[in-house]
Amino acid sequence: MSSIPANLPLRNDLIGEEPYGAPQLDVPVCLNVNENPYAPDPAVCDTIAKRVREIAPTLNRYPDREHIELRQAFSDYLARESGTRLDVDELWGANGSNEIMLQLFQAFGGPGRTALGADPTYSMYPEYARDTFTGWKLAHRNADFTLNVDKVLEAIAEVKPSMVLLTSPNNPTGTPLPMEDIERILAACETAEVVGAGEGVHPILVIDEAYVEFRKPGTPSAVSLIKDHPNLAVSRTMSKAFAFAGARVGYLAASKGIIDCVRIVRMPYHLSAVTQAAALAAFEHADEQLSRVEHLRETREATAAWLKEQTYKDQPLEVAESGSNFLLFGGHFDKREAIFDELLKRGVLIRVVGPDGWLRVCMGTDEEMETFRNALVEVLRIVEAA
């Protein structure tokens, strides 16, 4: 039952809607929102405190609305991480990659426009579309959650979207998106029509790389394609591998033209001076912030192998291929809500998300994963027998 008074003039299309959000519960083992479970090192915390202390006397003034120093830090980091050096005017920061995505929908969506995704996909995308009055269409992935590129190309030709939005690694499945698939879709976007737009206007391709630091070593990033493809935008975040979710910092890598479009719709002074200072401090310690990524990859691979050894109703569990810090598993859970509830009773919070029959768990500390494994073995037997 909604708590919103009926006499408030809420938009008609929002009546009955609920705020988005994964459960935030005080439980011993939180494995539901794909955070890095390891806290920042003390040296990182000290540098954050130092940077914030330095700018504190200036908080009576608005921050640098173009956040030039931070955009340079994005450039330096991507040059190391992806091997591609971008100019400052090819980068843009925001309060988490959620705000980046909303800005893209504000700039390139709107009434009469359509965005195209591929399901299963991140559950916030249709909400960005709703909030910007943008149409939302889907091309369906293969049974193993890999992208069906032919279906995407057919949908681009049919729908004539202004944006094509794909996630690599995909959320909630973790499925990597091969570079050759990205390049095929880019080629289609560079000649496709956009419904309601003039001649010579073509859709942009947005690749959401929120989890890309967890990819297998040696796998290239879509950032490497930006210099040759002005219709490509790549979204990144510091919330996942960078262990910086509480700071809410995301960023966009794209051509100057796309960045300038986003700048039109951004709120003035949208990144606070405190946020900018904290992010700069984190980049000073990038190696420390990312030091646990390899261990989390190893945890993912070990957990995937273990899950495949488990059974539910005499069938082995399925595990989707993952290049992220989480695993989608199960495949045939006929009572996934019951499994979720029983795990929660044992202090383990995971996520009911994705297609029916599946659950998602993100990688925690070694101790947290041991608790998860022990609880899951017990819970599967209980739910089977119920």
Curated annotation (Swiss-Prot):
Catalytic reaction(s) noted: L-histidinol phosphate + 2-oxoglutarate = 3-(imidazol-4-yl)-2-oxopropyl phosphate + L-glutamate
Keywords: Amino-acid biosynthesis, Aminotransferase, Histidine biosynthesis, Pyridoxal phosphate, Transferase
GO MF terms, alphabetically ordered: histidinol-phosphate transaminase activity; pyridoxal phosphate binding
Transmembrane segments: none
Superkingdom of source: Bacteria
CDD domains, per the entry: AAT_like (cd00609)
Post-translational modification N6-(pyridoxal phosphate)lysine, affected residues: K240
Signal peptide: none
Record EC number: 2.6.1.9
GO biological process: L-histidine biosynthetic process
Pathway assigned in UniProt: Amino-acid biosynthesis; L-histidine biosynthesis; L-histidine from 5-phospho-alpha-D-ribose 1-diphosphate: step 7/9
Protein name: Histidinol-phosphate aminotransferase
Organism: Bifidobacterium longum (strain NCC 2705)
Gene label: hisC
